[in-house]
């Protein structure tokens, strides 16, 4: 199932401490988050391994979830242990061998001033089957992308290190613009005109067998898959420059480009703005790191056992 296929509307979702049927997991139309985008979320994958279903880097995702709530003074009234057990149980109840997991916290229904006031913080966890985000073929052949006319907001405007629901309007605009023009995904630039990231992915550039990825000061989300790729690359002897500025023009002259993300995993980029990148397909460095990533998450290696939470 790709990102653009319909989800099956059945199963169980955890909401505010209760397990409810999928069709009953609803919110009030006057919820604060519905009007002002005041929610935070995570996207996490669980993989079907020989040792059972395993959530990848759950603890790091939980860290970011709670940290994302802080700029919005959002109090999450459930402990890490409660959210972990809720997530494991949702996966069990939905009988999922592999899954995409979506923890969500948002200001709910009470009042509709811009200030959330006494609005409650509602919390939910859903999980469903979700295959390659941009399609299985994209993992092998790469995707066509377009640099968007929409710019990424700066951290001086809205906290870019928080995974905030409302901020993804920017991502939606960029992605849909690219798809209208025949591309499969977008790249957004920051306010200085340097490369930031994809709508839901971090980006890596390969040049002379070295890796470059925009630093946190470039208005990017501190991606957990980004960190995974950096670790895997350094373990394989690659030099990684993870705090750089990348110009738009550098994209076109790269040896290789690829996206990373919990949904996108490791997806090669074969073309930017109708300009072929490298050999026009998945480059050798990208292929090596992609293979290492999938070997890791599917537990075909014993490396980094600490990154897995078993259902």
Region locations from a protein language model:
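Helix-start/capping segments and mature chain N-termini
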Residues: 1-78, 85-89, 112-311
């Amino acid at each position: 199932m790709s990102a653009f296929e319909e989800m099956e509307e059945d199963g169980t979702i955890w909401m505010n401490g209760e397990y409810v049927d999928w069709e009953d997991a609803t919110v009030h139309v006057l919820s604060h988050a519905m009007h002002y985008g005041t929610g935070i979320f995570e996207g996490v994958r669980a993989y079907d391994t020989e040792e059972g279903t395993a959530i990848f880097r759950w603890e790091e995702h939980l860290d970011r979830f709670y940290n994302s709530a802080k700029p919005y003074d959002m109090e999450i009234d459930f402990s890490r242990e409660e959210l972990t057990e809720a997530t494991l149980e949702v996966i069990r109840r939905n009988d999922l061998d592999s899954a995409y997991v979506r923890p969500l916290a948002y200001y709910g229904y009470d009042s509709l001033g811009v200030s959330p006031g006494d609005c409650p913080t509602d919390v939910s966890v859903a999980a469903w089957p979700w295959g390659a985000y941009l399609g299985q073929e994209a993992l092998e052949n790469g995707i066509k992308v377009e640099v968007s006319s929409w710019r990424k907001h700066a951290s001086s405007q809205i906290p870019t290190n928080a995974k905030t629901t409302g901020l993804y309007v920017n991502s939606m605009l960029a992605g849909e613009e690219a798809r209208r023009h025949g591309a499969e995904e977008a790249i957004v630039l920051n306010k200085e005109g340097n490369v930031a990231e994809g709508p839901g992915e971090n980006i890596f550039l390969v040049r002379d067998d070295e890796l470059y990825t925009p630093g946190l000061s470039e208005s990017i989300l501190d991606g957990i898959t980004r960190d995974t790729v950096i670790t895997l690359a350094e373990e394989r002897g690659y030099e990684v420059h993870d705090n750089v500025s990348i110009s738009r023009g550098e994209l076109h002259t790269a040896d290789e480009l690829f996206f990373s993300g919990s949904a996108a995993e490791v997806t090669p980029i074969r073309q930017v703005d109708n300009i072929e990148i490298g050999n026009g397909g998945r480059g050798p460095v990208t292929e090596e790191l992609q293979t290492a990533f999938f070997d890791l998450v599917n537990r075909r290696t014993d490396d980094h056992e600490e990154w897995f939470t078993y259902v």
